Amino acid sequence: LLCLVGSEMCIRDRPGIGVHPAIVYTADLCGADVIMNLGGVQAIAAMTYGLFGNAPADMLVGPGNQFVAESKRILFGKVGIDLFAGPTEIAVIADETADPELVAFDLVGQAEHGYNSPAWLFTTSKKLADYVMQRVPELIADLPDLPRENSGAAWRDYGEVILCDTDEEMAKISDEYAPEHLEIQTKNLQWFHDRLKNYGSLFIGEETTVAYGDKCSGTNHILPTKGAGKYTGGLFVGKFIKTLSFQRMTKESTKEVGAACARISRYEGMEAHARTGDVRLRKYGFQN
């Protein structure tokens, strides 16, 4: 967990290893004056309440496990947050033109995140579906201990391969799932790009993969999960912009605005609201 609060950062170390030098270097490049060796719920508490002599945060941003998500939910209101994110998800839309080996690798690549990370394949090709269902367990078995354990549990409990009749059916099912990460590996890439509406981030063509978005290509990987892609997108720069509204009117404008306010308020049964318009109409000579 790397968190920026003004010029302070919280960095989670790795048991028995410590903080990776590359992370410390990155923090320095970002202008950190203070680095706290904290992660998870402890870091969230420290940032929210301004512990250890540091200023409290106005906003908490970033992914984490279920404890981090619950902490952000509890503290939402005292501080702003980006979104409530559940376990990471991947879906792949693939037809007979897709490379089944790439599809299998990509599904395993995201299942590695944790035991409850869904991996879904929507395909019109039974041949590809059969290959992937055989190949994924082989790829999982070849992983180191922890990734193998996570991927195996995720694929066993949350993996799905759905055989569809048409491209339209694949698109419809995908929009119903609204996956966090969605790959398209089909002949007609542009059609799916134009047709699909619900997802966190879209990866078009076999040349890209979800791991690129996670690690290095530049698209934000703090994304909606659990179907939230139906109503929101991922983190973007606008989340850090606070919009403020204001109004200033002339006395002459009160003739129309004050009268409209009074009428609307009375339709709603809010007499005190209406009278704030009436009193100005009288003061400025527009009403007896």
Predicted segments, located by residue:
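Conserved NAD(P)+-binding/catalytic subdomain of aldehyde/semialdehyde dehydrogenases
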Residues: 29-118
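Short loop-to-beta-strand entry elements in the cores of soluble alpha/beta enzymes
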Residues: 61-63, 83-94, 107-133, 151-162, ...
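Active-site-proximal loop->helix
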Residues: 17-30
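Flexible, glycine/charged-enriched surface loops at secondary-structure junctions
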Residues: 57, 80, 117-122, 142-154, ...
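Short acidic loop-to-helix transition motifs that present clustered carboxylates
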Residues: 16-20, 38-46, 189
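C-terminal core of ALDH-fold dehydrogenases
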Residues: 175-288
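Single conserved hydrophobic/aromatic residue that forms the stacking wall/gate
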Residues: 1-6, 11
